[in-house]
């Protein structure tokens, strides 16, 4: 898919998602390129966005929302969110997803869990028959992360520490590291996520099933 066509789809998805918003809602705001477009589209409706209370899933999304004059609040202000709007890296036919390409998987999962309604914006390039072409992000605490990586390595085809082009290790907003892991053929992603949760040091993975 050409980038222009993909961006057009993202814009259409963003406009459709805005229709689910009502004045005064507490909105969980995702992270990523699709959400950047969503923020841009939402900024055109000042009477709506000015009434929203926004809980962001990353410092980057929080800044972009504030730059567009939106009201970003701390997550501890509300025990429950009205709606969460986010993107996805892969979505299968059962609506299971791989997320975390933008590095915000932990905060995205926390926010999604607290939302009464969840909307995920995924253009056709993200829709797959089976999860796994996109590497599964696994968030691991910084302390001894090499040990945890060695423990998860047998579960995957390969694991790779996420780094910048300069070679610097990328840290999440929680100061953790991320390993991008290629899933083995025919692996059950839900079972894999369960196995990962048993390994000390693993915080969460980018697998999003049913809450």
What does each of the following model-derived ranges do?
Residues 2-8, 59-211:
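Conserved phosphate- and dinucleotide-binding cores of soluble alpha/beta proteins
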Residues 2-86:
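N-terminal active-site beta-alpha-beta segment that forms phosphate/nucleotide-binding
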């Amino acid at each position: 898919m050409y980038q222009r066509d993909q961006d057009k789809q993202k814009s259409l998805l963003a406009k459709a998602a805005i229709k689910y918003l009502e004045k005064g809602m507490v909105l969980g705001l995702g992270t990523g390129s699709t959400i950047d477009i969503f923020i841009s589209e939402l900024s055109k409706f000042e009477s709506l966005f000015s009434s929203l209370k926004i809980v962001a899933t990353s410092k980057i999304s929080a800044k972009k929302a504030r730059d567009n004059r939106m009201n970003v609040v701390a997550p501890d202000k509300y025990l429950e969110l009205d709606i969460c709007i986010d993107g996805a890296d892969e979505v299968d036919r059962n609506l299971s997803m791989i997320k975390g390409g933008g590095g915000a998987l932990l905060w995205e999962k926390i926010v999604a869990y607290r939302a009464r309604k969840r909307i995920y914006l995924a253009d056709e390039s993200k829709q797959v028959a089976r999860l796994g072409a996109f590497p599964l992000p696994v968030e691991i605490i910084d302390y001894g992360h090499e040990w945890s990586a060695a423990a998860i390595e047998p579960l995957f085809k390969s694991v790779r520490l996420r780094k910048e082009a300069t070679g610097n290790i990328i840290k999440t907003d929680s100061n953790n590291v991320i390993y991008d892991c290629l899933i083995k053929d025919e692996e059950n992603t839900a079972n894999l996520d369960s196995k990962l949760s048993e390994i000390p040091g693993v915080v969460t993975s980018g697998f999003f099933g049913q809450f």
